[in-house]
UniProtKB/Swiss-Prot annotation:
Keyword Cytoplasm recorded: no
GO molecular function terms listed in the Swiss-Prot or TrEMBL record: DNA binding; zinc ion binding
Listed SMART domains: TOPRIM (SM00493)
Function noted in UniProt: May play a role in DNA repair. It seems to be involved in an RecBC-independent recombinational process of DNA repair. It may act with RecF and RecO.
GO biological process: DNA recombination; DNA repair
Full protein name: Recombination protein RecR
Toprim domain sequence ranges: 83-178
Family: Belongs to the RecR family.
Length: 201
């Protein structure tokens, strides 16, 4: 184990930064040094923003999104189509779809996927409230935007079965060739999904 090269406060900062996705020990040291160099214009405001977020973040009681208000900004947006509901696994997935800005829908965050091997069952996810939202009658289409993994497929089938009694259309995101992708570089599963999801041209 290497000896510390800075005081415990800086070492702790580096250690915590290294726990962020995409940052290893070296990147964390560089980030820490950058923050220290920009103490007034970056480190101080960042510390304040983190404290504010820590104090005010709450889950939306309607959709499960994370925000500083309840209902969240998306659920409170009257311009969104209340008949379209996009079901996602995580808040990160919700944010990714929002960046695409393709559909002014509302969302429902499950908080993960069903995974019998990991002991994650229906009661561990935000599934009951999904059924309750659909039962209110305003939603006309449920778009399943879950990952194309075994657990994602299991979750999608469970949701489809759970909502079978309601007059809603259930759709899935198309899977296949990414924009700008070359067929030669795609795996067989992706190509098969693309062929099955083909559309008129």
């Amino acid at each position: 184990m290497t000896a510390p090269i800075a005081g415990p406060e800086i070492e702790r900062l580096i250690h915590l930064l290294a726990r962020l996705p995409g940052l290893g020990p070296r990147s964390a040291r560089r980030a820490a040094l950058h923050l220290i160099r920009k103490r007034t214009e970056l480190l101080g405001p960042l510390a304040e923003a983190l404290q504010q977020a820590y104090n005010h973040l709450i889950p939306c009681q309607i959709c499960g999104n994370i925000d500083t208000r309840d209902p969240c900004t998306i659920c409170a947006d009257a311009k969104r189509d209340p008949t379209l509901l996009v079901v996602v696994e995580t808040v990160a997935d919700l944010w990714a779809l929002e960046r695409a800005a393709a559909l002014p829908a509302r969302y429902h965050v499950l908080g993960g996927t069903l995974s019998p091997l990991d002991g994650v069952g229906p009661k561990d996810l935000n599934l009951q409230s999904l059924t309750e939202r659909v039962a209110q009658g305003e939603i006309r289409e449920v778009i399943l935007a879950v990952n194309a993994t075994v657990d994602g497929q299991t979750t999608a089938h469970y949701i489809t079965d759970s909502l079978a009694a309601f007059p809603v259309k259930i759709t899935r995101l198309a899977h296949g060739v990414p924009v700008g992708g070359e067929l030669d570089y795609l795996d067989e599963g992706t190509l098969a999904a693309a062929l099955r999801s083909r559309t008129n041209f």
